[in-house]
A protein has these predicted regions:
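Fe(II)/2-oxoglutarate
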Residues: 160-169
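Short, conserved beta-strand element in jelly-roll/cupin
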Residues: 79, 90-106
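A short beta-strand-loop-beta hairpin characteristic of the jelly-roll/cupin
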Residues: 99-120
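Non-heme Fe(II)/2-oxoglutarate
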Residues: 1-69
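Short beta-strand His + acidic residue motifs that chelate non-heme Fe in jelly-roll/DSBH
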Residues: 86-89, 106-108, 127-140
Length: 169
């Protein structure tokens, strides 16, 4: 990756997606001050198998988005209240981000000290989440995003070597 947060070729209708999702209740996250709601569920391995839309989110707009993205993992609406941010962290899988509402909100790469604005601009962005980062809302309204995990791939070791470690006497 050149950057932590890059625009993809995928154009979306963020207004239509926001309208489609607006009538759903979000739950308070037990780990932080954010509100979140999964829009799909896992029927297999959390990190490796494609997730399916929950019936209440299985609409033509969401089906179209999922077709554009291909098989994906967990997808959730995340609301970051004004004046709040996430703890610094890194994740194991990359994620797509679609901003549905934002006002002076940023994803911040803490390794390079770069800030990326989260704009409601009808584009899907790809984020390299293995970098130490945070999301911060410096604005006066909630930052709402649809965040979608990319699936991990199974890797096959080429020419593995076995070693045995024994304690010294």
């Amino acid at each position: 990756y050149l950057y932590m947060f890059e625009r993809t070729h995928i154009k979306v209708n963020s207004e239509a997606i926001a309208r489609d999702l607006q009538h759903h209740t979000l739950q308070q996250d037990s780990w932080d001050s954010m509100h979140k709601q999964d829009i799909n569920h896992c029927e297999g391995n959390f990190f490796y198998d494609a997730w399916q839309l929950k019936p209440e989110f299985d609409t033509p707009i969401m089906q179209d988005l999922m077709l554009k993205l291909g098989p994906v993992g967990q997808a959730k609406i995340i609301v970051v209240p004004p004046g709040t941010c996430y703890q610094a962290h890194a994740d194991v899988e990359d994620r797509y981000h679609i901003t549905l509402q934002a006002d002076h909100s940023y994803l911040i790469d803490l390794e390079s000290d770069e800030m990326y604005p989260t704009l409601k601009d009808d584009w899907c962005y790809l984020m390299n989440t293995q970098r130490l980062h945070t999301a911060a809302n410096f604005g006066y309204q909630d930052r709402c995003q649809l965040v979608i995990r990319r699936l991990l791939t199974h890797h096959q070791l080429m020419d593995p070597h076995h070693i045995h470690i024994k304690p010294m006497q």
